[in-house]
Every structure is written in structure tokens, then in C-alpha cells.
UniProtKB/Swiss-Prot annotation:
It is found in: Cytoplasm. Heterotetramer of two alpha chains (FadJ) and two beta chains (FadI). It catalyses: a (3S)-3-hydroxyacyl-CoA = a (2E)-enoyl-CoA + H2O; a 4-saturated-(3S)-3-hydroxyacyl-CoA = a (3E)-enoyl-CoA + H2O; a (3S)-3-hydroxyacyl-CoA + NAD(+) = a 3-oxoacyl-CoA + NADH + H(+); (3S)-3-hydroxybutanoyl-CoA = (3R)-3-hydroxybutanoyl-CoA. Its EC number is 4.2.1.17, 5.1.2.3, 1.1.1.35. CDD domains: crotonase-like. Residues 1-190 are annotated as: Enoyl-CoA hydratase. This is Fatty acid oxidation complex subunit alpha. GO terms for cellular component: cytoplasm.
Length: 708
């Protein structure tokens, strides 16, 4: 019996053939190496049939053209030669498609990403639908890779070097009208007439491509080799600054484009295949692909086994501050669920509404939505100063001050005013959920739902189950968080949960280094060089020095002496330094200069004279090993279920460098024995806070790893 085909050819009476890609048994199309012979046979058949006057390439999937190459085939590559052959195989097929003597048109509806866009680029014309799900881009850089199917060569020739580099170096995805404006597609039409438009294009023949939309300045730059060299040099400098040398893919992308534009497409494709192979085998891409697979896996999980989540039709948010406003905003705009915000003051409610409106209005200004859509989404958010209109709330998210008595009162109020099924989800950042649930008559409905600030940008939420939380409550809360566009990790109850617990020791160590004479700039630069998006002092300013001061005593009380924050930091609070929020912290705020400057008076407040500035790798290592050690303790204590969750929590919650794969992947890279040695060295110099976790010592003795 014949296997089901992926590529099916149908001939129309007008001489146009339709080639439909439909991977059997999958919801989305992805490109796989085994498709090579099949598509080559189809192309040979088309070439041999003189009755075919034009070809239109379409997808058989709803709302998806081609989502990219199947990433799992990269893990099957044992050598760089294997990876290079994958790229070269793609080149052969796409070159065959491009060299067909008849017009070839890609009719794009839905996601057209990575290898999918490279397939479309090999066609002579492209038309896309105006479907909101139609997005185009080359996001390979986000996996530590580069477009390996000719994308580094065809994209700059179509849209210009500057635009192509921007797309490839950021991995950004374009909406239909953006793609049309830059010349990536030749037309963007309603989905209902997409096929008809593509057929008409094919019948019209190979007309010269529309001139790409470029500024006069870019035309001058890109029109000469000297101008292009300026573009490449500038891109190289920006990449070096942004990546700190930690990510090899961006520099290789620039080199592919440079070589292709200088020495011709054949040379460019050769360089592309070679660089692609090197990146596939690199530890950085391996780590970033592990993050991709982990998040893909987690999307399928309920957090509570086979238990089905309950439907959430209405949400209430207690507190209209930054967190409350952000939570209500993602509930209405992302999850499209009505949210009612309660605050004791009208000011708080106004702030929550203004917060949501500002975010939606950005979408209008960027033409991502119409004013009518914005207003309809705003209508989903209502406000109250009393417990009115909330009887039917399915989830109540509490986002009030870190005060246990206040949270107890909230629990009692909600149980009195809402239904028996209502879930009480606390956004506490440090208080154990079990302690909050002590005030509940229905503790099985109480759960932690810890968001990170700013809520609309940070992808992670911690779903915290205490010992009496029901499986249904967990499953419903996880499903709700996913609807908000979040990546949830289920963690067990305990002070600081997972993310804030590992972050606290990292921050405390940075504070110790500051008190030893390291400068604020040096500390921040050392950790940025290591791979964090911001340094610890900047982070403390952003989070709030006062917030850190409130959390530390809770962690110290519950978890022990190693969480004790340096007492010298009390002097910062006495000087009314809260960070960015009151314009007074480690850095100066409110000035006209773009670059941040350290507030030099912070040293005198702390009674310090900076000037030690130890070697940057040593500074970073001292902070990072504290985080790694505590992550292992969290696994030991079953705060996190598995190393995978610990990696995702650290990357998405605090910006742990993705190219290292997360704390547990990084420990595997370092080796447990090596990490124990580093910790014991610090323990002998700085004390018991560096004592290695028992599990780490055991792994060092046995020579085991977290991942196979």
C-alpha cells in the first residue's frame, strides 16, 4: 500500500497546477529531510508536463502555511557533515523550484516561518492572506541557528540587506501589511480570494519584481560595495555589543549575507551550509533547542495529570496597582476573559484602566488592531470599590501588599462573596501559600499564581500548590495562565517558591561583592557579559530596593541564615532609596542622557569607597554558583518537579542566559564535580553560605548528570 503523500499536484483547465503541501497526521506543516525525494519527483513531473503554464504552492492546513523545518531532525545529526548535508539538500530542492521555467507563486495563509519562508522565497512571486494568523519571519536565530535553506541569500536580494539583516538577527515576525510594504510579498488579500489571486499571478507570467520600498539613504548604501561594507560593519558592532560574544549565530548570519553579496549566490549558499552545520553542532544552539523542546512539551501538560480544567468565564482581580493592572490587562486582551478589578480607591481603579488602555493603544498606533477592537477589549474590564458583580467569578487573583493578615482578610471576603467553586489565586512573591490558606474554609481552592513584572512582558508564571490544593484547582489555574499567553511551571509551596528563592541568593552575593568594594558598573557589566539581560544592581532598582528588603526577612525566617541580606542595605532605605519607582536608587533617573549613570552618592550612603573591580568572570561566577546551588536544593526538596521546569523557570522568570540552557543544563556543562570544587573553595573563603547541596555532592561522587 502506498504511503500518504505530503505533496499533491492537481491540474486546472486554465493550465495552472496547484501543489498542495499537507503533512499527514499533523496539524501544521513542517519541512523534513525525507520529503526531499518526493518534492524532487513532483518538480520533475511539472517540468516534463508542457501543458502546465504556471504553479501555485498552497498549504492543506488551516491557518498554517509551513511553520518551519522539523527541529528534531537536527538532533539526529551526529557530525557537522550530517548537518551540512541537510542544508545542502534544502538548497538543491529550492534551486530546482526556483529554476522551473514557468511562473511559481506561493499562496501564504497562516504561519510562514523559517524553512517555510525560505520555500516561499524560492518561488517567483508571493501573495499572502490578511488572516490575523498569517505571520512571516525567519526565527532561527532564537534557536542559535541561521536560515539554512537559502534564506541568507534570497532574503537580502528581495528586501535589501538592511531589512534582511534586521529580520534574521532579531527573528521578528511580520504581519501581512508589513510584509507587503517591504516587498517580501507582492500582494496581501482577503483569505477568500487568496487562491484566485495566486492563480491570476501565475497566469500573468514572470513579471519583474516590484521595487522594494527603501529610503534614499538605504538605496545609496546598498547600491555600492563600500556602502554595503558600512552596513555589515555596523551590524557586526551592534551584534557584538548585544550578544557579548555569547551567541555565535548573529555574526555567522552577517558573514553569510556579506559573502553572498560580495562573491555571488553560489558562494553564499556554500558559506550558509557550512555555518549552519557549525551552529547545529554548537553547545549554544543545543541548549536553546532544549529550551524550545521543553516549552513545547509543557504546552501539552495540565500540571495535574489527567485532571480536566474547569472553564473560566469571569475573573476578578483584587488590587489595581502595577501587578493587578497588568494581570487584569492580560486577562482581557490575551485570554479575552472579562475581568473585574476591585481596589479600595478610585485612583487605583483609574490606574488599572489606564494601564490596560495604554497597552492596547500601542497596538492601535502600530496598526496591529483597530480602535474598535481596542474599545471592545477595554469593555471586558470593569471596576469596583466593593464586592459587587463578582458572585460568578471563577478565579479571583489577589494582588495586594505582602501582608499575611491582609491576605487572610481577602480569602475570607472572597469565600463570603463568591461561589463554592471559586479559586482564590494569590500573586504573593514570597509568603507560603499554606499560610495564606489557613484562613480558608475551602483550602482546596487556594493556590499561588506568581506573575513577574512587567506582567505583559514576562512570559513565566509560577503556579504554587500547597498540600491541600486540589488537582482540579491546579489544572484550571494552569489552563488559565496559558490562555493569558504565559508559560506556567507548577511548583510546591515554600518561602520564595522557586524563582525568587534562587534569585535572592544571587542578589545577596552581588550585594556582598558591592560591600567588598566592587563598583556598581563593574558588577552589572560582569553579569551582562555572562549573559543576563541586566545586571543585579539594575535589577534591584527595577524590582524596588524596598521590595527586596521585605522579602529577605521572610526567606531568612523560613529557609535559614544563608538568606540573610547585608544589613548595610538598611542604610539605602533610610535614605529613601527605592529604585526606579521613586527615582532614587543605584542609578540616576530623570536625566536627559540615554545611558544610565550610577548615582555616586550611593557609595557614601553605604560607607564605601569602590575601586576593587575583581576580574569579571570571577565576579559573575560568585553570583551564579549561588543560584545553581539553590536550584539543586529546590529540586532536592521537590519545590520543582524536574530539572526541565527549573531551567524554564530561570530563563523565563529572571533571564538566565538561554544559550546555557538553564541552571541544570549549565551544571551538566560544568560538571557536578567541578561545581562542588568551586563551591567548596568559596566556602573555605567566605563561609557556610557556599556549602554545596547534598544532591550535588552525590552527583559529583557518582559522576551523574541531570540530562542524558
Amino acid at each position: 500500500m502506498d504511503m500518504e503523500k505530503t505533496f499533491n499536484l492537481t491540474r486546472r483547465d486554465d493550465g495552472i497546477a496547484i501543489l498542495t503541501m499537507d503533512v499527514p497526521g499533523e496539524t501544521m506543516n513542517t519541512l523534513r529531510s525525507e520529503f526531499g525525494p518526493e518534492i524532487s519527483d513532483v518538480l520533475a513531473e511539472i517540468k516534463a508536463d508542457t501543458s502546465i503554464k504556471g504553479l501555485v504552492l498552497v498549504s492543506g492546513k488551516k491557518d498554517s502555511f509551513v511553520a518551519g523545518a522539523d527541529i528534531s531532525m537536527l538532533d539526529a545529526c551526529e557530525t557537522a557533515t550530517d548537518a551540512k548535508q541537510l542544508s545542502q539538500q534544502g538548497h538543491v530542492v529550492f534551486n530546482e523550484l526556483e529554476s522551473l521555467p514557468i511562473p511559481v507563486v506561493a499562496a501564504i495563509n497562516g504561519a510562514c516561518l523559517g524553512g517555510g519562508l525560505e520555500l516561499a522565497l524560492a518561488c517567483h512571486k508571493r501573495v499572502c492572506s490578511l488572516n490575523p494568523k498569517t505571520m512571516m519571519g525567519v526565527p532561527e536565530v532564537q534557536l542559535g541557528l541561521l536560515p539554512g535553506g537559502g534564506g541568507t541569500q534570497r532574503l537580502p536580494r528581495l528586501v535589501g540587506v538592511t531589512t534582511a539583516l534586521d529580520m534574521m538577527l532579531t527573528g521578528k515576525q511580520l504581519r501581512p501589511k508589513q510584509a507587503l510594504k517591504m516587498g517580501l510579498v507582492d500582494d496581501a488579500v482577503p483569505e477568500s480570494i487568496l487562491l484566485r489571486t495566486a492563480v491570476e499571478m501565475a497566469l500573468a507570467g514572470k513579471r519583474p519584481a516590484k521595487k522594494k520600498h527603501q529610503s534614499f539613504f538605504n538605496k545609496v548604501l546598498e547600491g555600492t560595495s563600500a556602502g554595503r561594507n558600512i552596513i555589515f560593519d555596523q551590524a557586526g558592532k551592534q551584534v557584538a555589543k548585544k550578544t557579548q560574544g555569547n551567541y555565535p549565530a548573529p555574526a555567522k548570519i552577517i558573514d553569510c549575507v556579506r559573502q553572498g553579496m560580495t562573491k555571488g549566490m553560489a558562494k553564499g549558499l556554500e558559506v550558509e551550509a557550512s555555518h549552519f552545520a557549525d551552529l547545529v553542532m554548537s553547545k549554544e544552539s543545543g541548549a536553546m533547542r532544549s529550551v524550545f523542546f521543553a516549552t513545547t512539551e509543557m504546552k501539552k501538560e495540565t500540571g495535574a495529570g489527567d485532571v480536566e480544567p474547569q472553564k473560566v468565564n469571569k475573573v476578578m482581580v483584587l488590587g489595581g496597582g502595577l501587578m493587578g493592572g497588568g494581570i487584569a490587562s492580560v486577562t482581557t486582551t490575551k485570554a479575552k476573559i472579562p475581568a473585574r478589578v476591585k481596589d479600595i480607591s478610585e485612583t487605583g481603579l483609574s490606574n488599572a484602566l489606564a494601564y490596560a488602555y495604554k497597552l492596547l493603544d500601542k497596538g492601535v498606533k502600530r496598526r496591529h488592531m483597530t480602535p474598535a477592537v481596542r474599545d471592545n477589549l477595554m469593555a471586558l474590564m470593569t471596576t469596583t470599590t466593593e464586592y459587587k458583580g463578582i458572585k460568578d467569578a471563577d478565579i479571583v487573583v489577589e494582588a495586594v501588599f505582602e501582608d499575611l493578615a491582609l491576605k487572610h482578610q481577602m480569602v475570607k471576603d472572597v469565600e463570603r462573596e463568591c461561589g463554592e467553586h471559586t479559586i482564590f489565586a494569590s500573586n504573593t512573591s514570597s509568603l507560603p501559600i499554606g499560610q495564606i490558606a489557613e484562613a480558608a474554609s475551602r483550602p482546596e481552592n487556594v493556590i499561588g499564581l506568581h506573575y513577574f513584572s512587567p506582567v505583559e512582558k514576562m512570559p513565566l508564571v509560577e503556579v504554587i500548590a500547597h498540600e491541600k490544593t486540589s488537582a482540579e484547582t491546579i489544572a484550571t489555574t494552569v489552563a488559565f495562565a496559558k490562555k493569558q499567553g504565559k508559560t506556567p511551571i507548577v511548583v510546591q509551596d515554600g518561602a520564595g517558591f522557586y524563582v525568587n528563592r534562587i534569585l535572592a541568593l544571587y542578589m545577596n552575593e552581588a550585594a556582598q561583592l558591592l560591600l567588598e568594594g566592587q563598583s556598581v558598573e563593574h558588577l552589572d557589566k560582569a553579569l551582562i557579559k555572562f549573559g543576563f539581560p541586566v545586571g543585579p544592581m539594575t535589577l534591584l532598582d527595577e524590582v524596588g530596593i524596598d521590595v527586596g528588603a521585605k522579602i529577605s526577612p521572610i526567606l531568612e525566617k523560613e529557609l535559614g541564615e544563608r538568606f540573610k541580606a547585608p544589613t548595610a542595605f538598611d542604610k539605602l532605605l533610610a535614605d529613601d532609596r527605592k529604585g526606579r519607582k521613586n527615582g532614587k536608587g543605584f542609578y540616576l533617573y530623570g536625566g536627559k542622557k540615554k545611558a544610565k549613570e550610577v548615582d555616586q552618592t550611593v557609595y557614601s550612603v553605604l560607607g564605601l569607597k569602590p575601586g576593587v573591580d575583581t576580574e569579571a568572570t570571577e565576579v559573575a561566577q560568585r553570583c551564579v554558583v549561588q543560584m545553581l546551588n539553590e536550584a539543586v536544593r529546590c529540586l532536592e526538596e521537590s519545590i520543582i518537579a524536574c530539572p526541565r521546569d527549573g531551567d524554564i523557570g530561570a530563563i523565563f522568570g529572571i533571564g538566565f542566559p538561554p544559550f546555557l540552557g538553564g541552571p541544570f543544563h549549565y551544571i551538566d556543562t560544568l560538571g557536578a564535580a567541578n561545581l562542588v570544587k568551586i563551591l567548596e573553595n568559596y566556602q573555605s573563603r567566605y563561609g557556610s553560605r557556599f556549602e554545596p547541596a547534598a544532591k550535588l555532592k552525590q552527583m559529583a561522587e557518582e559522576g551523574t548528570r541531570f540530562f542524558s
